[in-house]
Design a protein with these regions (language model features):
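Terminal low-complexity, intrinsically disordered regions
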Residues: 1-2
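Long, histidine/aromatic-enriched segments associated with O2/redox biology
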Residues: 5-423
Length: 423
């Protein structure tokens, strides 16, 4: 079923339809839906520590507007009708369909007016300039106009939704398709992925040539649980909440591809304790974390120290141990609250292991601040590279490469169809 989502298209849809349960239907009354497009957490189950459990199957669509200049009223109405078709067809839930559509700086450059300065959107090139250290190589800036993130526990839903958006089916879940994107948007990229064990193991086995280092119990490709109550904020925390802001109820979204070709080296060159040092911190050990981090419980620190306290020892650990932890570095930006709401997921698109990284934050500056903490042992140093440890001891940085970056504004639901910069 995961493979069908990765392949996409009519044949995959037909194959999945015969093996899938009928999903719950949606609503034609938009007042029954949250105005925040990214309000997912109240509509999906919680895991054993009370965090929202992300749906198993993911689909990302990168879209380019087919016309020059500012979108016209007819196209705006068509986009809204197409999105409402999805809402009529599927319940707003993990068993139905959850989705967002966001718009890039390149899209807003079509207009003569600017976004309000406190909206928080920035060009992805500015992110690359500030956080991607030289060894990351050349990172591609996304130049699409719009980005959609669709998710469901039912792979049939994703395939039917995509088919409806591009005019390949006449109805979804018994609802007629009254409008589509086919004359509005060009699909410039399509990315897929999955969450939750055993999908990382199974997907690697199916898609990636060679030995499979990922265990069946691993929640992600690098093996360790990474979402805790001290690393995931609420949706409120990342939302634009000022009632006089034109995009109140919106948020900013960062989207990047991390090529995880170092995963095999991660497992082959480091034992479990060494991987724990690099994923969490030198203060952690396997007795407390377990093989996949699940023994840590609600928070990512140890029984003796919070992760915020451990984070204060980052420079000291680099000097004394020659190694620092990924979570340890990031926690320096999480005091008092974590600024990034992560919705990333593993992927094996095109036979390569990836992380499709997605975060929501109040402003892109928040993402930059967090990513600097990940990039440098001592980001406040005038010469931060002088304090670095070898890349293979620098959290997980030596095991992936950033390929592409994009930033988007996710407007509230009532402004989601081709918003103007200052509606």
């Amino acid at each position: 079923m995961k493979a069908a989502v990765a392949i996409g298209g009519t044949n995959a849809l037909i194959a999945v339809r015969s093996r899938s349960e009928t999903p719950p239907g949606g609503t034609d009354d938009r007042s029954n839906l949250p105005d925040r497009q990214f309000a997912w957490n109240d509509y999906i189950p919680k895991n054993n520590i009370g965090l929202a459990k992300g749906p198993s199957h993911r689909l990302l669509l990168h879209l380019k507007y087919r016309r020059e200049g500012v979108p016209n009223r007819t196209d705006r109405e068509t986009v809204e009708d197409a999105l409402r078709t999805l809402e009529r067809g599927f319940e707003w839930s993990n068993e139905g369909l959850l989705f967002t559509i966001g718009y890039s700086p390149a899209y807003f450059d079509r207009f003569d007016t600017d976004l309000p300065p406190d909206t928080g959107l920035r060009d992805p090139s500015e992110v690359i300039d500030q956080v991607d250290i030289e060894r990351s190589g050349n990172v591609v800036v996304e130049t699409d106009d719009a980005h959609m993130h669709l998710t469901s526990d039912n792979p049939l839903v994703l395939l039917e939704a995509e088919a409806a958006l591009f005019g390949d089916v006449s109805e979804i879940n018994g609802e007629p398709v009254t409008a589509d994107f086919s004359e509005i948007f060009k699909k410039v990229d399509r990315r897929t992925g999955f969450t939750g064990a055993p999908l990382p193991h199974e997907s690697w086995k199916e898609d990636v040539p060679g030995d499979n280092p990922v265990t069946e119990e691993a929640p992600v490709l690098f093996g360790f649980k990474s979402l805790f109550t001290d690393s995931q904020p609420s949706e409120d925390h990342v939302a634009i909440t000022s009632s006089d802001h034109p995009f109140c109820g919106g948020t900013t979204e960062h989207v990047s591809i991390l090529r995880d070709d170092g995963v095999r080296k991660w497992y082959s060159e480091h034992c479990t304790e060494e991987r724990i040092d690099r994923m969490f911190s030198p203060s952690h050990n396997s007795d407390e974390t377990g093989q996949h981090g699940r023994k840590l419980g609600r928070q990512s620190g140890t029984s003796e120290q919070s992760m915020v306290d451990i984070a204060e020892e980052t420079v000291k650990n680099a000097r004394e141990h020659g190694v620092v932890g990924h979570a340890q570095k990031l926690a320096r930006a999480r005091n008092p609250l974590p600024p990034l709401l992560r919705r990333d997921f593993p992927s094996t698109d095109n036979g390569h292991p990836h992380t499709q990284f997605i975060s929501l934050q109040r402003t892109i500056d928040d993402f930059i601040d967090v990513r600097k903490m990940m990039s440098f042992v001592d980001p406040e140093n005038e010469r931060p590279a002088a304090s670095e440890v070898p890349i293979e001891n620098h959290g997980i940085q030596g095991f992936f490469k950033v390929i592409r970056r994009g930033n988007y504004l996710i407007p509230p639901r009532h402004l989601r169809a081709f918003p103007s910069p200052n509606p």
